[in-house]
């Protein structure tokens, strides 16, 4: 074996591996040049002496290709049976990898701004610039018909606050939305509170939810009250105060007869005696008091 190694080393130094990239036949199959060595020996195709040539892919400083970038696609790959299969070198531009990654970074950063643009377009109609200041555009006012206003007013006199089912039922019957009914009731309540605060309407005459039959008009005096009739006659300039023995009806007829003297005789002829009129009025006053 020592003689074989001695013969092997001079054959490697003979200048077969002087090229920076040796051929596959000289580097991987040296057993064909020395028929004395068996093919299955441990020194086959991968033995290099320290003084010999550089291994595959190594560039010495003295070579012409030293310092240059090596193309990884120029290497030769061996198949199963040991034959070298050369693949042509491809540039990066053929595969579309010539452009660096940072060129795509700008487009990636612009994606969120493009998605947020429709949101700004949707929100723009709600805000309008007036004299350089943003102003929110108000929705148009709802115009209620006379029928709707009458129905809402009747319901407000019954109760000032509506529950959800009641509001939904009222809105469906009037052809309005629940929001419109709610806003109308809110405006009506605020208007009533403002009137009460200014003193135009006393609190006792304002409609309340506890008393649905409340009436805002003052009570009218009864017709059969003697005091009310005497008050009404006292305001008249030509009226005379009633005497104790005359009824209010007879005194009123006498006053009217003084205005029309021609009809005084006919009125006095049809008048009953004063005592007959005082008797039923006394009975009526006794029943009231």
Curated annotation (Swiss-Prot):
UniProt note on tissues of expression: Mainly expressed in several neuronal tissues and developing tissues.
Biased composition (Polar residues): 32-46, 206-220, 242-253
DNA-binding region range list: 137-196
Keyword Phosphoprotein listed: yes
Sequence segments annotated as region (Disordered): 1-49, 198-253, 270-289
Subunit structure comment from the entry: Interacts with XRCC6 (Ku70).
Record-given protein name: Homeobox protein DLX-5
Species this chain originates from: Rattus norvegicus
Taxonomy of the source species: Eukaryota, Metazoa, Chordata, Craniata, Vertebrata
């Amino acid at each position: 074996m020592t003689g074989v190694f001695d013969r092997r080393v001079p054959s490697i130094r003979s200048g077969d591996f002087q090229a920076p990239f040796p051929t596959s036949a000289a580097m991987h199959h040296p057993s064909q040049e020395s028929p004395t060595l068996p093919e299955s020996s441990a020194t086959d195709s991968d033995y290099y002496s320290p003084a010999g040539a550089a291994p595959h892919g190594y560039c010495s400083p003295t070579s012409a290709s030293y310092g240059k970038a090596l193309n990884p696609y120029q290497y030769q790959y061996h198949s199963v049976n040991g034959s070298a299969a050369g693949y042509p070198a491809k540039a990066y531009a053929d595969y579309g990898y010539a452009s660096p990654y940072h060129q795509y970074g700008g487009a990636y950063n612009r994606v969120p701004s493009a998605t947020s643009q429709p949101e700004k377009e949707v929100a723009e109609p709600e805000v309008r610039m007036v004299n350089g200041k943003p102003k929110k555009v108000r929705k148009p006012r709802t115009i209620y018909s006379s029928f709707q206003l009458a129905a809402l007013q009747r319901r407000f006199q019954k109760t000032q606050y509506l529950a959800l089912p009641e509001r939904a039922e009222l809105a469906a019957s009037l052809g309005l939305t629940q929001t419109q009914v709610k806003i109308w009731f809110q405006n009506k309540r605020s208007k009533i509170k403002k009137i009460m605060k200014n003193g135009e309407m006393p609190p006792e005459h304002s409609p309340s939810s506890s008393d649905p039959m409340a009436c805002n008009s003052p009570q009218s005096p009864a017709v059969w009250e003697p005091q009310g009739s005497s008050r009404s006659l006292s305001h008249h300039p030509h009226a005379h105060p009633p005497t104790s023995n005359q009824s209010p009806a007879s005194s009123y007829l006498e006053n009217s007869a003084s205005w029309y003297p021609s009809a005084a005789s006919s009125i006095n002829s049809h008048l009953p005696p004063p005592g007959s009129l005082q008797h039923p009025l006394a009975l009526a006053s006794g029943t009231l008091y």
